[in-house]
Amino acid sequence: MEIAVVEALEKFYGKSDREIRLFYSPGRVNLIGEHTDYNGGYVFPCALDFGTYAAIRKRDDKKVFMASLNFDLKVEVDLDSIFYDKEHDWANYPKGVLKILQEEGYEFSGFEIVFGGNIPVGAGLSSSASIEMVTAVAVNEVFNLNIDRINLVKLCQRAENTFVGVNCGIMDQFAVGMGKKGHAILLKSDTLEYSYVPLNLEGYKILITNTNKKRGLLDSKYNERRSECEKALTYLKKALPVKNLSEVTVERFEEYKDLIPDEVLRKRARHVITENKRVLDAVKALNDNDIVKFGKLMIESHNSLRNDFEVTGKELDTLVEEALKLKGVVGSRMTGAGFGGCTVSIVKEDAVEEFIEVVTRNYTQKIGYAPTVYVTGVGEGAGEVEYLRR
């Protein structure tokens, strides 16, 4: 894929003696800690070993040419006039990054950029954050903007929030921008305090299973859940001096939950508060080398997302149910925003083939179409890639 984007840039925009540089940004999966990030809580993502490549070449004018090996659409943008255009589809993500960089006072000329990746779009594995981050890192490096990585992460989140209009938390951009091979990231969403936790998965594999249900984050119930959490917090604030739901302990919630008059809002808050504790318990389990305990917490997380947060649906539930029937599966849960997308499972290496065969067969029988299973590793965060021409 990396050489393909370099060759495509020359094919689409011609050869020249100007240097073509190559950058990469991974996808991510959140192992546990779902719908906690916009509630100020803990999340536990890791970068994956697949992602988005971008080949970039400077120009002298203010024109930016964008193309992708994954989509037919090619886009031309004038740096003096960047605005959201629904017709530009995927290109609005990198365009948003350029707009935010300009708003922050950074100057750069035009360029040609060609993207290509192997992250399934709409699966909840952060294809959007990956394309944002690879754009930000590429422009930062090529034009010597000297922006530190955490600020690049924040810029990319702002691009998705304000330019594209998706009210996402910061986890996706943080995971793809700050990922570290062989480690997951324990991230506190409101303060951005973080630490790397070694993922000692000897004898186990991470399997990501895509429901292949069509969905879009923009038109899902994501923003509705966010607003429900904010309403629940308003009630709890009457008795508790807290800034967000994640500051409420499970014990305090049990004591004060009746302040929330609406049962639905109470369930939403209960998920966030218990999920936050599950993340910390999961990190402890990993540090204790207790992969079985980690798996149990993943299952509890899924049950809470199904029963209290109500964001799973029959496709995700079927994948988890079928996975948990197999002996070699220690844990499985939905990951991402929900309503489709993917599950993440921890599976013994010698059970991977059985998982793929049995889960695919049973899901297809129950749902009517097949899922896609990815066996993945934990990869590096975004950065420049050396390449050799063919």
UniProtKB/Swiss-Prot annotation:
<dbReference type="Pfam" id="PF00288">
    <property type="entry name" value="GHMP_kinases_N"/>
</dbReference>
<dbReference type="InterPro" id="IPR019539">
    <property type="entry name" value="GalKase_N"/>
</dbReference>
<comment type="function">
    <text>Catalyzes the transfer of the gamma-phosphate of ATP to D-galactose to form alpha-D-galactose-1-phosphate (Gal-1-P).</text>
</comment>
<dbReference type="InterPro" id="IPR000705">
    <property type="entry name" value="Galactokinase"/>
</dbReference>
<feature type="binding site">
    <location>
        <begin position="34"/>
        <end position="37"/>
    </location>
    <ligand>
        <name>substrate</name>
    </ligand>
</feature>
<dbReference type="GO" id="GO:0006012">
    <property type="term" value="P:galactose metabolic process"/>
</dbReference>
<dbReference type="InterPro" id="IPR006203">
    <property type="entry name" value="GHMP_knse_ATP-bd_CS"/>
</dbReference>
<dbReference type="InterPro" id="IPR006206">
    <property type="entry name" value="Mevalonate/galactokinase"/>
</dbReference>
<keyword id="KW-0418">Kinase</keyword>
<dbReference type="GO" id="GO:0000287">
    <property type="term" value="F:magnesium ion binding"/>
</dbReference>
<dbReference type="InterPro" id="IPR022963">
    <property type="entry name" value="Galactokinase_bac"/>
</dbReference>
<dbReference type="GO" id="GO:0004335">
    <property type="term" value="F:galactokinase activity"/>
</dbReference>
<dbReference type="InterPro" id="IPR020568">
    <property type="entry name" value="Ribosomal_Su5_D2-typ_SF"/>
</dbReference>
<feature type="site" description="Transition state stabilizer">
    <location>
        <position position="28"/>
    </location>
</feature>
<dbReference type="InterPro" id="IPR014721">
    <property type="entry name" value="Ribsml_uS5_D2-typ_fold_subgr"/>
</dbReference>
<feature type="binding site">
    <location>
        <position position="160"/>
    </location>
    <ligand>
        <name>Mg(2+)</name>
    </ligand>
</feature>
<dbReference type="GO" id="GO:0005524">
    <property type="term" value="F:ATP binding"/>
</dbReference>
<keyword id="KW-0067">ATP-binding</keyword>
<keyword id="KW-0299">Galactose metabolism</keyword>
<keyword id="KW-0963">Cytoplasm</keyword>
<dbReference type="InterPro" id="IPR013750">
    <property type="entry name" value="GHMP_kinase_C_dom"/>
</dbReference>
<feature type="binding site">
    <location>
        <position position="128"/>
    </location>
    <ligand>
        <name>Mg(2+)</name>
    </ligand>
</feature>
<dbReference type="Pfam" id="PF10509">
    <property type="entry name" value="GalKase_gal_bdg"/>
</dbReference>
<keyword id="KW-0119">Carbohydrate metabolism</keyword>
<dbReference type="InterPro" id="IPR006204">
    <property type="entry name" value="GHMP_kinase_N_dom"/>
</dbReference>
<keyword id="KW-0460">Magnesium</keyword>
<feature type="active site" description="Proton acceptor">
    <location>
        <position position="172"/>
    </location>
</feature>
<keyword id="KW-0808">Transferase</keyword>
<feature type="binding site">
    <location>
        <begin position="122"/>
        <end position="128"/>
    </location>
    <ligand>
        <name>ATP</name>
    </ligand>
</feature>
<dbReference type="InterPro" id="IPR036554">
    <property type="entry name" value="GHMP_kinase_C_sf"/>
</dbReference>
<feature type="binding site">
    <location>
        <position position="222"/>
    </location>
    <ligand>
        <name>substrate</name>
    </ligand>
</feature>
<comment type="pathway">
    <text>Carbohydrate metabolism; galactose metabolism.</text>
</comment>
<feature type="binding site">
    <location>
        <position position="68"/>
    </location>
    <ligand>
        <name>ATP</name>
    </ligand>
</feature>
<dbReference type="Pfam" id="PF08544">
    <property type="entry name" value="GHMP_kinases_C"/>
</dbReference>
<dbReference type="GO" id="GO:0005829">
    <property type="term" value="C:cytosol"/>
</dbReference>
<dbReference type="InterPro" id="IPR019741">
    <property type="entry name" value="Galactokinase_CS"/>
</dbReference>
<keyword id="KW-0479">Metal-binding</keyword>
<protein>
    <recommendedName>
        <fullName>Galactokinase</fullName>
        <ecNumber>2.7.1.6</ecNumber>
    </recommendedName>
</protein>
<keyword id="KW-0547">Nucleotide-binding</keyword>
<comment type="similarity">
    <text>Belongs to the GHMP kinase family. GalK subfamily.</text>
</comment>
